[in-house]
Design a protein with these regions (language model features):
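Beta-strand/loop substructures that line and gate deep hydrophobic ligand-binding cavities in soluble
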Residues: 147-151
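Residue-level recognition of beta-strand termini and adjacent short loop/turns
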Residues: 72-73, 143, 173
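Conserved Ser/Thr-centered positions that define the repeating blades of beta-propeller domains
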Residues: 153-155
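Beta-rich strand-turn-strand
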Residues: 140-146
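Amphipathic/hydrophobic helical signal segments and adjacent flexible N-terminal regions
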Residues: 1-63, 67-69, 168, 172-173
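Beta-sandwich strand segments
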Residues: 57-59, 159-163
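Central antiparallel beta-sheet cores of small beta-barrel/beta-sandwich binding domains
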Residues: 28-35, 47-49, 53-136
Length: 173
């Protein structure tokens, strides 16, 4: 075996061992267009907007910094966020990965909660739909992918939806 093919075989084995698949019949994942569709998110973003006032709660300003980065290998995106909603410090981290023709996104917030969403991408429109049926967000990418216009909604019954916040994220890097 030539040194080049030995190195290639060793590299393939390392990938299989790291993925826990060395002795399974699972196919090694292949990065494809579904992964590439997430590339528009990659970068540093400044998020500004406000919550939508209710009869009981006034509007609160939102200002956060969001960073989307590829996890090594390019199969997953990690999203970190921190900032303020009103006077409250907020933050968290999520991992976004391919799940069939859509994506799974689990966000772990600074209050100890985990929020699972299904992300669907249709051209410049990205829709996050909470698996619990209580939250959803529609993002329209504009300015060649440099701006995200996001409309968040919540529901107590999964049928009737109420606007909860509107924000604009601008890519700074």
């Amino acid at each position: 075996m030539s040194p080049a093919s030995a190195a290639s075989a060793e590299s393939a084995r390392v990938v299989s061992v790291a993925a826990g698949m060395e002795k399974t019949d699972r196919a090694t994942p292949v990065r494809d267009g579904r992964h590439q569709a997430l590339a528009v998110l990659i970068g540093n973003w400044i998020n500004e907007g406000a919550t939508v006032a209710t009869a009981d709660i006034p509007t609160a300003a939102i200002r956060t910094s969001d960073v989307y980065e590829w996890v090594p290998g390019g199969f997953f995106v990690v999203h970190t966020a921190f900032g303020k909603i009103g006077d409250t410090s907020v933050g968290g981290v999520s991992i976004i990965g391919v799940d069939g023709e859509a994506y799974d996104d689990t966000f772990y917030d600074s209050f100890g909660n985990a929020h699972r969403s299904r992300l669907e991408i249709d051209g410049d429109v990205h829709r996050w739909i909470g698996v619990d049926g209580r939250a959803r967000c529609t993002v329209t990418m504009t300015d060649g992918g440099m701006t995200q216009v996001a409309h968040h909604e919540s529901s107590v019954d999964g049928v009737t939806w109420t606007a909860s916040m509107d924000v604009v994220l601008r890519k700074v890097i």
